[in-house]
Structures are given as structure tokens and as C-alpha cells.
């Protein structure tokens, strides 16, 4: 009996082995699926994340892969175009790059679709500190306009500009690029500025505040110092909500090491949460 069982296992092993060691055909054969993350690709530790793999045609089996691993990290056997992979209470160790593939039973052993585009999951308490620079430079001629660029490391983030002595955010931009530009009119450009960025939706993850940047008239000379030592500068407040939307709970986006100050009720004079493209700045 034991000999029969061993022979059966040896017979099944090639089929099982080829199923977890995928053979990828040319792209024209089986188009790649789409891989997305809910609630976001950037989350804080402890959040439940769902990775969704959507195939362009009904499939039978889906596999979730990480680079350097031959076998799928997770399997889902579903007779549909969508499979969900659940990552509960994620940790920083679960961050990284993911891809997914799908296959059908009539494709033969080990044949999978083209892999999806890369999805990078970032699990962190706070985002890296951005840089703040002036274009063309921090020393401007009288009446000249200046552009401030707040640059982070991630695309599709929301950027906030602060000015020393002003409690409310000065300008707010959402950018598909890993940076955002803020235009200051020459007559009001001189001053001390800092910026930060955050994920555009809850659960919010905030960056550290940038170092301050001093804009001055020619002959005055700029100076730079850490934002934490700048008088009148507060730690980043919570991301402003969309007009008409309920502001998220402050505790839902409190990053480690930051003391968040709630935003005061905003007026058109103090804050425009979504300046139009033609807005010349402050």
C-alpha cells in the first residue's frame, strides 16, 4: 500500500511542480492582468490591504508573485475575471513589489499569462522628508515672481506649503509627479517657507516637514535652518478635506514623532483647497 501511494505521489509531482513554476508565453497569447491595492499603495502598519488582480478574460486560477520567488506567494482559484488577495494588519516587512498572473485550465500545465505591471506597496509610519527649493533662486529682484518646488519621492501625492507666521496652509496642490510647484507673486514673495506632502486619501500618511527656505530681496541674503527651530512654524496639520466632505479623524493620520495641529475653519482669504490652474499664487 505504501509503495502504491509513493508511486501516485511521484506521478502527480510533475503536474504540481509545473503549476507553481509558471511558464510565461508571448504577450500576444495571454494579455497581462491589472493589479491594484485598496485602500491605497501607501499605508501605515496595521492596516488591512486588499490586492486585486483583474484579468481581461475569465480565468480559473490567479497567482500573486514577489520578485525573486518562483512560486506564487498566494493562490486564488476563482472562475471569474477578478481575484482578491487579503493582507491583514500589514507590517513593513510585507511592503515591496508585487505582480499577479492568471491562467486557464485549457492552457496546459505551468502556462500563465503575462505578469501584471509592478505594484509597489509601502508600509510606513511617515513618508520621507521632502526638499524645498526656489526657482530660479531664493534671492529675487524687487517685484519678481518666484516658484517654490516641494519635491518628495512618490507620485500622486498632495503637497502643502506653509509660511512662517501664518497658521493655515498657504497653498495646496495635488500632483501626479513626485513634486509640486507653488507660485509666489513678487511683492509678497519674501518670507520663510516650508512644505510637506501626504497621501491624498485616508488612511493618511504624512511626511516630515521640509527644512525651511528663506526668500529675500537682493542684498538681504537668505538663510536656512531646520523647520523645527523656525519661530512660528508648527508641525504639519492634518490634510485638508475636499469642500463639503467631512474632515477625517485626527487620530487616523497622526504620524510618529509629529504633533498635529487641527486646521482652523478656512476662508477664501486664508486657504483655497484647490486653486485653479490660473491661480498666480499668493
From Swiss-Prot:
Protein name: Osteoclast-associated immunoglobulin-like receptor
Boundaries of every Ig-like domain copy: 22-116, 126-219
UniProt GO MF annotations: collagen receptor activity
Bias (Pro residues): 273-282
Annotated GO biological process: immune response-regulating signaling pathway; osteoclast differentiation
Gene expressing this chain: OSCAR
Region described as Disordered: 221-282
Family indicated by similarity: Belongs to the leukocyte receptor complex/polymeric immunoglobulin receptor (PIR/LRC) family.
Known glycosylation sites: 48, 145
GO annotations of cellular component type: extracellular exosome; extracellular region; plasma membrane; specific granule lumen; tertiary granule lumen
Biological role: Regulator of osteoclastogenesis which plays an important bone-specific function in osteoclast differentiation.
Keyword terms of this UniProt record: Cell membrane, Disulfide bond, Glycoprotein, Immunoglobulin domain, Membrane, Receptor, Repeat, Secreted, Signal, Transmembrane, Transmembrane helix
InterPro entries (alphabetical): Ig-like_dom_sf (IPR036179), Ig-like_fold (IPR013783), Ig-like_Receptors_ImmuneReg (IPR050412), Ig_sub (IPR003599)
Disulfide bonds: 53-100
Stretch forming the signal peptide: 1-18
Origin: domain of life: Eukaryota
